[in-house]
């Protein structure tokens, strides 16, 4: 029992007011571990106060562990406040508690530091990183539904906003909630100034994630669990375990065995999310097999 770690004061201290503060807290938490192997992957852009932007990693536990838990934050930039706090809390917890010999934790802090620093969901190129994991050597997916909504999502002038909003409401009624949400937020690769844009090539964050995957030799581990922290969907204050593995797959079965029946599946309609294109989940699925 570690009451000091789970006190409101401790949990509040895990949360930062901005990206720079979150990075500093994460670095400090890593420095308290003698062998965390803290690393930085630096971006060419800077934050609003000219601060350096980095995706940082740390490793707790046996370097040769066959089982690895990956904790990833700020895929959607501004959502990183929650994920970063969880990572800091976890690092603090294992100051006093020891991991099993064959289990390690890989922390990936601020996968999208630009969005985190500038309070944006997207990255430095206006890309939704969680739609960027498609095969850019193949023809890109076409979101026909988004095409029908695009002009009203981004009207040409402010005077058209009210009428556009009404048309979108009518579209939602016509299409139904799920079809509308898939069209709106499922991901698109055609309108660079639109919402949920997945880009035309691999982002810097994606390239760094691929580098991290190989640097830590994750392909050689026997079991990998990945928790990518997001906020904004579902009931306030409730943590939904969303699994985007194909229905009935070994990944879904394993997730439910580990995390229980609270695991939801967008493909089956049991989640607050809908099926989407180019998720970072698909990178992990493809890389781990």
Predicted regions and their residues:
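Structured catalytic-domain cores with a bias toward divalent-metal coordination
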Residues: 1-289
């Amino acid at each position: 029992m570690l009451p000091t770690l789970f006190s409101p004061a401790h949990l509040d201290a895990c949360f930062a007011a901005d990206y720079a503060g979150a990075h500093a807290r994460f670095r400090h938490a890593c420095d308290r571990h003698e062998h965390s192997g803290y690393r930085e992957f630096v971006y060419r852009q800077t934050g609003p106060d000219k601060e350096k932007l980095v995706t940082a990693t740390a490793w707790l536990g046996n370097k040769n562990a066959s089982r690895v838990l990956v904790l990833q934050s700020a895929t959607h930039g501004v959502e990183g406040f929650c994920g970063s706090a969880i990572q800091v809390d976890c690092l603090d917890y294992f100051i006093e508690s020891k991991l099993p010999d064959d289990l390690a934790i890989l922390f990936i802090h601020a996968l999208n530091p630009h969005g985190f620093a500038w309070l944006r969901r997207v990255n430095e190129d206006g890309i939704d990183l969680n739609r960027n994991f498609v095969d850019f050597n193949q023809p890109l997916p076409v979101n026909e539904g988004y095409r029908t909504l695009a002009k009203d999502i981004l009207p040409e002038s402010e005077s058209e906003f009210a009428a556009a909003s009404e048309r979108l409401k009518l579209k939602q009624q016509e299409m139904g909630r799920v079809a509308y949400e898939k069209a709106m937020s499922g991901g698109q690769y055609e309108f660079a100034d639109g919402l949920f844009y997945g880009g035309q090539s691999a982002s810097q964050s994606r390239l760094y994630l691929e580098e991290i995957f190989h640097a830590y030799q994750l392909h050689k581990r026997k079991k990998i669990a990945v928790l990518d922290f997001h906020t904004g969907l579902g009931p306030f204050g409730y943590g939904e375990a969303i699994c985007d593995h194909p229905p009935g797959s070994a990944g879904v079965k394993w997730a439910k065995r580990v995390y229980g029946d609270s695991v939801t599946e967008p493909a089956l309609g049991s989640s607050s999310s809908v099926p989407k294109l180019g998720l970072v989940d698909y990178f992990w699925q493809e890389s781990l097999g």
